[in-house]
Amino acid sequence: MIQSSSSISQDSLDLPSILSTFSADEPEDEPSPTAVKSTKPQRPTECLICGNSANGHHYDVASCNGCKTFFRRMCVSDRSFECKAKGDCFDLTKRKVPLKCRACRHQKCISVGMNPLAMEVDEKAASSSNFKKLVKRAQDLEPDDDCQVTAVVNKMQIVKPVDSIESKMQNITDMLVYLETKVERFRKSAYNPHWNEFSGLEYLLESECRIGFGDRFGPMPGWPLRRDQLGPPRLPKPPSPGKPRDSQHSQNIKQWFFYNLLTTVEYAKTFMFFHRLSSRDKLILTRHVALACTNLHISYSSIRRNLEVIIEPDGSEPMTFNDTHYSASVMSVAPLIRCQIKNIEYLLLKAIVLCNPAVPDLSAKSQEIISLERVKYADALFNYCLRSRSDGPPHFAQLIQIIDVLERQQRMQKDLHLLLVAPKVAKLPKDLVMRVIEDIMDS
């Protein structure tokens, strides 16, 4: 049962960890157009730090969401980085796209004039070593003056955050919007690993987070594929004598059921709360929620393109064995269309589906952690419905009911997998078995 309360403490905003290392390229949802005077300032178009599209002026500088978030996190932390190159990784006069270097990115934020005094931070954050240095620089204080933070606090240039529900909800939705851009980039990227790289779900959970591979590998060339390149989706078949088994894997054609589940697992690994769970509870939770999150993701991706069927990014359709199997694969599409789900609602609903404390066999400690996370995202969804829908509470209830559809859908898919797919998989050589799929479907 999901309960929605009207208060969330600022300290409870346990947001995706992906935000600390990457920049956002896509603009936030813009407000509804209103009457605008001709003297209205023009919105900046280019981030002065990384050169991507700017979302506005942040800390006195035209910048994107990613650079704003990066500068703030660096300011309130004690971490420091050194450039491993020549110190010019973010010099856009020497290159069109900056290199991935946190030291140079931080220095560029400072050099273009990002102002730490424009931040709202509490006294704990203001005591961080980076913030002290930047405040000293901004105020041009003497190096031996150790009272700069106190002076700034006394001058009320640092204030405690306003206890506003709207600002807290906005923080949550901004983070999820940014994370989703990374998830979609990963899904459409040229990164296409062989399933043999992963010995199983447990190995995948304990290995590095791969969401950033979307930026590293770039988009898959040649997508969408031509119809004659696609062919019907099918399970890998035992190779003919003398034929190399690697021929089952194509560099530009993905095994989408495997890759979509891989994407969902990497999505889960970006959440800070997830790393507070034990290895055992991570495995238990992921085995139960991965398929439901995947179904919601691919269903929403399809209806966002005005499609009533599941179409993957390369233009292919998912593998189905019969009408019952097909019906199970598209079960969640109609409810999403019926409730006219918005992007923010989808993002919050997916986070709620991920945070399921009712999964059997979870430890009491993990149930408590996950329950608090679910309430946080449920609160955000409820508040969003109230602010953006005339029928806010009924619409919220309709969205929450989709979770039951997703549960029934994944239960049917797992039963059909056991009936139709598992017998075929049992006949395959071990190196052709996608262990990540089997670990999730056999639960």
Curated annotation (Swiss-Prot):
BP GO terms, sorted: cell differentiation; regulation of transcription by RNA polymerase II
Compositionally biased spans, kind Low complexity: 1-20
A single GO cellular-component term on record: nuclear envelope
Record has Zinc as a keyword: yes
Effect of loss of the gene: RNAi-mediated knockdown results in arrest at the two-fold stage of embryogenesis in the majority of embryos. These embryos have incomplete ventral closure and morphological defects including elongation defects, and either absent or irregularly placed seam cells in the head and tail regions. Surviving larvae also exhibit morphological defects and contain vacuoles.
Keyword terms, alphabetized: DNA-binding, Metal-binding, Nucleus, Receptor, Transcription, Transcription regulation, Zinc, Zinc-finger
A molecular function GO annotation: zinc ion binding
Principal cellular location given in the protein's record: nucleus
Domain of life (superkingdom): Eukaryota
CDD domains documented for this protein: NR_DBD_HNF4A (cd06960)
DNA-binding region per UniProt: 44-121
Annotated spans, Disordered: 1-40, 225-249
Localisation: Nucleus
Keyword Transcription found: yes
Zinc finger (NR C4-type): 47-67, 83-104
Function, in words: Orphan nuclear receptor (Potential). Required for embryonic and larval morphogenesis and probably for seam cell positioning and migration.
Family annotation (PANTHER family): NUCLEAR HORMONE RECEPTOR (PTHR24083)
Family named by the database record: Belongs to the nuclear hormone receptor family.
Protein name, as recorded: Nuclear hormone receptor family member nhr-60
UniProt organism field: Caenorhabditis elegans
